[in-house]
Amino acid sequence: MDNFAMIIFGASGDLTKRKLMPALYSLYREKRLTGEYSILGIGRTVYSDDNYRSYILEELQQFVKSEEQDTALMASFVSHLYYLPMDPAKEEGYPQLRQRLVDLTGEVDPDNLLFYLATPPSLYGVVPLYLKAAGLNTPHSRIIVEKPFGYDLESARELNKTYASVFNEHQIYRIDHFLGKETAQNVLAFRFANGIFEPLWNRNYIDYVEITAVENLGIEQRGGFYETAGALRDMVQNHLIQLVALTAMEPPAVFNADNFRNEVVKVYESLTPLNEVDLNEHIVRGQYTASGNKKGYREEKGVAPDSRTDTYIAMKLGISNWRWSGVPFYIRTGKQMPTKVTEIVVHFRETPHQMFHCAGGNCPRANKLILRLQPNEGIVLKIGMKVPGAGFEVRQVTMDFSYAQLGGVPSGDAYARLIDDCIQGDPTLFTRSDAVEASWKFFDPVLRYWKDNPDAPLYGYPAGTWGPLESEAMMHEHGADWTNPCKNLTNTDQYCEL
């Protein structure tokens, strides 16, 4: 590539060392970063160029998989790193940033200039204005912004206005790393590349859909951030609703950035508005409590002792369109769950007449499709088959596919894929301004309800469990239970390894 420069705000922070630098090294290792390029780190911590390179080299040795580490390649990669000690919250440093860019690239508008905001959200509205004041919002520049993009609908609109005053929409890349995962993208391929499933992908054949994205860790030293966010802002408003869109969207006429993102927005705009019954009965929020050697949320550093921040959310959603009317989507996310997993489970309707006995008398009769996004990525279809021997009893069995069966093909790093897309100018997997606002518009009533009703239920659940019992009660209204994932896709109800 010609004269590429990347400027990372928050270059001494956790996101940079854990995700961005390993992703950039991965691109370098795969020869996706070639030719003349410079990566300039911006942060308040004081480093020289050499000190910063040494720091990043140490972090790469910790956060890059051992089988991908190459001493010579890593040394070559960090030789392209530079550092400018600067407070991005103060405008006076930006002329110095402009000059450093010119020193590195020979011009203020290199062929490909990428800004990455790996900063606290409080700086999201400040940095672009200071870039504009310094004349750095050049025609060849792009800017990547991490979630959360806004705190609610009003703040999201204000941020969109700010960015629109500095950059064109095609220069703004709002990143959601879930969409960078190969398995998330494969949901689209599974649906639209296979004629046997798409005709069944509607209200006539699907009973309900579950989407689970949970972690087996707590807030991991992020108490200050999490107190202002909670599970709904941190996960539901962006990650989970994106997975709803991938599951429910119509096929684009032509697969390109505009058409794909148009269909995502249509799903968001079709979400059935939440009424008072929904707010009271179809949303369950929880907070993990101490269990065994695991702390409760209120015992975490940076958390108020009487905090009412949600670490678990379960919701029942509806989509008011021709394809999905009447099909509930149950989504949930939580911290301190028994395992870390993200998966989509599609429950098909039962056959209209049951001809056969069910082996054991207690096996599910409906087919179930599981799309596992992480870990142990794969797909499972559960179908009924005759039990060998006399009689005609049917038992549920699995047809499964694992990405590991492809034979050493890596699933790829989500950040590497998305950064590469941004370098190439492909915004397909990034969130557009209208999608941000449509998502917040749907969830804003929930936030207002909690604000206006501070005593709205917040259920405790012991750390290491599947969440509040009340979330099971919500599923029971549909005559169903949550599918609690096992470590391996092929585990059964009789054996479930976590």
Where are these predicted regions, by residue range?
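Secretory/organelle targeting and membrane-embedding segments
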Residues: M1-V145, F149-L498
